[in-house]
Amino acid sequence: MQVDTQRAVAQALGSSIASTHQLTGGSINNAFAVRLDDQREVFVKTNPGSDPRMFPTEALGLAWLNTAEAIRVPKVLAVSDSSNSSPAFLVLEFITSASPASDFAEQLGHGLAKLHASGADGYGLDHDNFIGTLAQDNAMCATWAEFYGVRRIEPQVRLAVDRGIAPTTWTQTFGSLLTRLPDLVGSEEPPARLH
């Protein structure tokens, strides 16, 4: 972890850093297990080139998921948006890996069902966020089909076409799909709390 990030994390947590260990598994951010001088262990994500809104909106999303008290969601301990020349980072409680219990899949299923059933204010969210490094519009829509079509599928198709990754015919093909989406997805469900 870069020295300026270590200093900023230590200042945000009120404790010096004793050690850092880079973790693997992600492709967008750098991830570290960090032991503090006060013996706490935390998880730190960094990304020097990230959009300044990326980590703050992730922190908002994690807090929103936590309010349902349905599944274990890491608590946000500190966040920096890279303003004022401070490095961008997100500090979460460290959850130690363990072998799953024999009924883990069942417990996870029940927890996710409880999370989804805890509801949401509508089909959308009160703030925009990111899918990877791509900005994601979460403005409310009248139905789930409209939200999924207009806020998820359409922007990704447009981006793929604009970047030359997909042929321009996709615009028309997916446009046709989006007009039929309400019929394809079936009966309307109430808004759910999704990650």
Model-derived features with residue positions:
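Juxta-kinase regulatory segment immediately upstream of eukaryotic protein kinase catalytic domains
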Residues: 1-19
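Active-site catalytic-loop/activation-segment of kinase and kinase-like phosphoryl-transfer enzymes
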Residues: 131-182
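Short beta-strand or tight-loop elements
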Residues: 16, 27, 72, 190-192
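ATP-binding pocket architecture of kinase catalytic cores
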Residues: 21-146, 150
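Generic structural marker for isolated residues within well-ordered, non-membrane alpha-helices
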Residues: 5-6, 62, 178
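Active-site acidic catalytic loop and adjacent metal/ATP-binding pocket
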Residues: 30-35, 76, 172-195
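Alpha-helical structural context
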Residues: 11-12, 68, 184
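Residues at helix-coil transition
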Residues: 117-120, 158, 186
